[in-house]
Amino acid sequence: MAAGQREARPQVSLTFEDVAVLFTRDEWRKLAPSQRNLYRDVMLENYRNLVSLGLPFTKPKVISLLQQGEDPWEVEKDGSGVSSLGSKSSHKTTKSTQTQDSSFQGLILKRSNRNVPWDLKLEKPYIYEGRLEKKQDKKGSFQIVSATHKKIPTIERSHKNTELSQNFSPKSVLIRQQILPREKTPPKCEIQGNSLKQNSQLLNQPKITADKRYKCSLCEKTFINTSSLRKHEKNHSGEKLFKCKECSKAFSQSSALIQHQITHTGEKPYICKECGKAFTLSTSLYKHLRTHTVEKSYRCKECGKSFSRRSGLFIHQKIHAEENPCKYNPGRKASSCSTSLSGCQRIHSRKKSYLCNECGNTFKSSSSLRYHQRIHTGEKPFKCSECGRAFSQSASLIQHERIHTGEKPYRCNECGKGFTSISRLNRHRIIHTGEKFYNCNECGKALSSHSTLIIHERIHTGEKPCKCKVCGKAFRQSSALIQHQRMHTGERPYKCNECGKTFRCNSSLSNHQRIHTGEKPYRCEECGISFGQSSALIQHRRIHTGEKPFKCNTCGKTFRQSSSRIAHQRIHTGEKPYECNTCGKLFNHRSSLTNHYKIHIEEDP
């Protein structure tokens, strides 16, 4: 089109207030966690769009708070209960609160488009396109010169990876794409032709036509904008600015911190409509829904066996070959790719280039290789200052130190019990949910995790791979070996805060502490007697059932307790391990020795 035929281009002053979406304090309280996360994403996306223009720009305090995972209410107030980003924005927010729209997404959409010019004929907002003057007024606003009008692409066109790098919308396109319904035909993975589940997965696809001008100086990876480069550089620097106030764990991104904090608050915003069960993550709800539909979407190409979880397919595929799992398509219904497009492309393009010279295993990163090599070298650079125990990873040391401090930041919402790590909390939760996905082929016993199943199967095979280097005794699992080795080293890291007594294992400390508290959580359903230890309850129940599982191999007599059988067998063997220190007389029972001591006490009062 000739220059003379073009429409007159209005000059538009663009400020942060124009792209800000604000809520009153009452509105903020009513937002669900998922809605607050959407609000953060929208505000940060709008701010990044302004920064990407390359002109000087003062970061608003509300953006700094959102990047740190804080609520946007710690900025100064103007008396109206609205975040003070300026009188202009406060006025807009007050005006926007008059809306009667009960839908959060409708509200945020209305606010996000309130200042965008509309094409009354097409009923679609414009995108401003043009160059910017390299100057700022006193208010920090930018002057857009020769702005041309261009319609926002419809959802149908948005899946064609339309390049929008030269366009800038004052209101984030992300809002509209999240609120408008998904298109019926899912986007395709260009490498395998596999379909993707969500439009957002296509939006995460690298912009193929964009000029990747920002390069990482360490690994030379390129990015299309500075914000992506800064996020990536944190992987090299180890910078973790976002710290959890509960457990002090640090994260490189605010979104990771927000997701982590749910483990402390116990918030479960995702609810199953079938059974009412709640989950902290949408992915956990998605996995749970398969238990109702009995859907098994992940199929092994080798043998045709199907699994309801992709992790189950990965574990199964190791039976066929100890190779890269990407050899087999972990996709849905045996053909379509279940990962996001960006994840799918990484799987196909990435190679395991870090080789271990000891065992030949390959790894995708040098840090993973370093962690692995400590298995061969025995290197444990992270040492506990309290007991001197060393660990190969810093995370293991942090978890261990909680034994000494007594800190248990992860708490069960059902019973209130605390745990030192999230993995132990997850194992404990299975007690309440009763979920058991792994069945033993020998005895049919159901177990809650694959690792527990492997340890259980060693009962049938007799395998004991964990061997003590001092005495040669073997164990089925490493935790039993570690506990046994403390007999040789004399290490007793678990200390009672009441009396100072120390123990080799945490369970012994827990049982001991009930002496001080008087707690007896194990109750017999038959007679109502309570016990401080579960083993005592098990032995007691045999009185009601009449069960005597311990049998003497010599005479066939049976006993309720193994200790009673051991004492009985001394009658046949003639063993008398208990000796009187006064007269040297031997006894086969400790109780007999105790009664014998009374004779000497009476003789020498």
From Swiss-Prot:
Region of interest: Disordered: 74-106
Annotated localization: Nucleus
Taxonomic superkingdom: Eukaryota
InterPro entries: KRAB, KRAB_dom_sf, Znf_C2H2_sf, Znf_C2H2_type
Zinc finger boundaries on the chain: C2H2-type: 214-236, 242-264, 270-292, 298-320, 354-376, 382-404, 410-432, 438-460, 464-488, 494-516, 522-544, 550-572, 578-600
GO BP term, example: regulation of transcription by RNA polymerase II
Full protein name: Zinc finger protein 354A
Record organism: Homo sapiens
Gene name as annotated: ZNF354A
